[in-house]
């Protein structure tokens, strides 16, 4: 098309030049600029142009002159405008789907032979539009965390596609992960390529919401009929420094008008006057504010309150202040209740889960093991003296004392104690190294079900699952095989405090982090058969300098089918 128009411009210019030379002074000519570009016909009823001695055309009633050269320029400009107004070639739509579910797979990389890299959006779509290749056959290498394409005869994992503007093709990949990657939850361009090819998308704001292009670890809770979401450090497009004081948002519950969790989450961000997700928990002191616990509890008057534990952080990731806060519904931000002693042995940290048993009604805080609890009232949450830790230390002692609580027969005793620190994996490792206890004596002795290799759980959550009739833990491994903080595990126990014995790997990210994973129990489907979990996908701590465009430093949602036979953990 472009070449044809350029040829036409050149021919028109040459014709105009010749006609201008042939027009005699004082003659009447008709210039008809139309599809046939007829020139020089006498016509009294049409537009009349008279040639003067200087070979200028002047309209009978006009007040300005146009030379043949100027008319040529006008014609060139008009056609150039038309050329520029022609829409660009439509992109070629490539959809990468899971070969078992036929659902589009996000974050699959397509790489050409000469290194053009493209990543599927949350519909599994890439909009390919590359000048020079729009009518060629192109080979794409196909790769993505937890998924793979079959090898061809030469060992290449990829596929040849005949590119045609506006056409489409599908590439199938096999899922290696047990968990299924669904979509990116935060950031910009979640459905970028879908928009470019005209595919329907589920989100109200599929390209940019709250000016958020990156968000760290999530905390959420159901409060007054909605889901409240809060994140750590958050990036914006306008400047490298973003929001370091807890941006937040709300969304509707799926059963109350919200999206089905298999489709996405429509966030309504709390925004500032510029439209950027604003601070909701800015506490005094230098450095960022992070929320480490979020829970909904009723006070003595029966009023539901949204409560949080926060920390202040300075380099290098040192917590120098800690406190409790309550959400102000009118201001839509947290207000400090009071400070906590940074060195206090029992503080709420981690994702909250409520449980009532013979001991009473408590809120437990899992990080990832639920080793701290407090009575399930707003007043108790705000009283540091009410917190208890699950520990094998003697009451009132510190870890450095290494005083193990044992019965008369020397058997180690774990129990809930006040003013005594919990013994989680890091503390347990120190006691084992000091010869004070053995790993088998602890309720926390998590190992790979298949290899019996020890699994060090770093961050995660624990919730009751009605489908499995057990407590289910989702946790990321510290010092995993493929990445420092990128391998996610599934474990279950009959008791909230364990014993936690066997785990199954459900997600792998090759040399990439996926830290602070969290199950979202409000999204459970089919009685808990399907659970939904998300985490922070980032190259931070991974040693990998290659950050995935748009996806890096954002939350990614996965779905896990608990009826999958690969998840069976024998009861012991």
Provide a role label for each language-model segment:
Residues 166, 173-213, 222-287, 296-346, ...:
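Beta-rich carbohydrate-recognition and catalytic domains
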Residues 90-92, 100-114:
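Short, ordered, surface-exposed loop/turn motifs in non-cytosolic proteins
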Residues 217-219, 293, 351-353, 459-461, ...:
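Conserved beta-strand position repeated once per blade in WD40 beta-propeller domains
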Residues 1, 16-22, 26-33, 49, ...:
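Short terminal hydrophobic/aromatic SLiMs and anchors at protein ends
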Residues 133-160:
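A short, solvent-exposed loop/turn motif at the edges and junctions
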Residues 115-130:
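Short, acidic Ser/Thr/Gly-rich low-complexity loop/linker segments typical of extracellular
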Residues 80-92:
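Beta-strand-rich domain onsets/edges
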């Amino acid at each position: 098309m472009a070449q044809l128009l350029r040829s036409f411009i050149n021919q028109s210019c040459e014709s105009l030049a010749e006609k201008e030379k042939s027009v005699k002074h004082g003659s009447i000519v008709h210039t008809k600029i139309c599809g046939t570009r007829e020139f020089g016909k006498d016509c009294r009823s049409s537009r009349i142009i008279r040639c003067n001695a200087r070979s200028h055309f002047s309209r009978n009633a006009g007040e300005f002159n146009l030379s043949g050269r100027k008319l040529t320029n006008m014609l060139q400009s008009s056609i150039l405008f038309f050329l520029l107004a022609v829409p660009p070639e439509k992109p070629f739509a490539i959809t990468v789907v899971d070969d078992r579910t036929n659902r589009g797979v996000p974050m699959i990389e397509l790489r050409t032979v000469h290194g053009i890299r493209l990543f599927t959006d949350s519909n599994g779509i890439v909009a390919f539009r590359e000048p020079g290749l729009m009518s060629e056959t192109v080979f794409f290498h196909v790769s993505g965390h937890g998924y793979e394409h079959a090898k061809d005869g030469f060992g290449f994992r990829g596929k040849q596609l005949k590119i045609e503007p506006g056409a489409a093709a599908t590439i199938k990949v096999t899922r290696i992960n047990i968990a299924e990657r669904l979509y990116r939850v935060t950031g910009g361009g979640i459905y970028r390529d879908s928009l470019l090819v005209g595919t329907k998308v589920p989100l109200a704001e599929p390209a940019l919401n709250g000016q958020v292009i990156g968000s760290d670890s999530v905390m959420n809770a159901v409060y007054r009929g909605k889901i409240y979401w809060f994140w750590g450090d958050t990036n914006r497009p306008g400047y490298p420094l973003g929001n370091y004081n807890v941006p937040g948002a709300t969304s509707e519950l799926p059963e109350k008008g919200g999206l089905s969790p298999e489709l996405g989450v429509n966030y309504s961000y709390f925004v500032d006057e510029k439209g950027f997700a604003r601070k909701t928990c800015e506490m005094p002191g230098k450095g960022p504010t992070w929320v480490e616990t979020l829970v909904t509890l009723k006070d003595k008057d029966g009023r539901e309150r949204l409560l949080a534990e926060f920390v202040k952080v300075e380099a290098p990731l040192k917590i120098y202040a800690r406190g409790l806060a309550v959400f102000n519904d009118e201001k839509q931000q947290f207000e400090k209740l009071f400070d906590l002693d940074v060195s206090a042995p029992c503080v709420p940290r981690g994702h909250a889960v409520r449980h009532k048993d013979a001991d009473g009604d408590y809120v437990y805080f899992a990080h990832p093991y639920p080793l701290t609890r407090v009575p399930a009232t707003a007043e108790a949450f705000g009283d540091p003296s009410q917190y208890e830790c699950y520990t094998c230390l003697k009451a009132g002692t510190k870890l450095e004392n290494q005083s193990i609580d044992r019965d008369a027969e020397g058997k180690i005793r774990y129990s809930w104690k006040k003013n005594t620190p919990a013994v989680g994996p890091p503390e347990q490792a120190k006691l084992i190294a000091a010869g004070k206890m053995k790993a088998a004596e602890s309720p926390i002795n998590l190992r790979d079900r298949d290899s019996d290799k020890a699994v060090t759980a770093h961050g995660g959550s624990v919730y009751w699952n009605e489908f499995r009739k057990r407590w289910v833990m989702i946790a990321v491994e510290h010092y995993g095989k493929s990445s420092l903080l990128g391998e996610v595990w599934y474990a279950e126990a009959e008791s909230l405090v364990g014993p936690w014995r066997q785990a199954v790997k459900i997600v792998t990210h090759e040399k990439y982090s996926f830290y602070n994973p969290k199950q979202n129990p409000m999204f459970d489907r089919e009685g808990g058969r399907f659970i939904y979990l998300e985490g922070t996908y980032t190259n931070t701590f991974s040693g990998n300098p290659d950050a995935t465009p748009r996806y890096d430093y954002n939350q990614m949602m996965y779905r896990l089918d608990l009826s999958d036979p690969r998840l069976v953990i024998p009861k012991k």
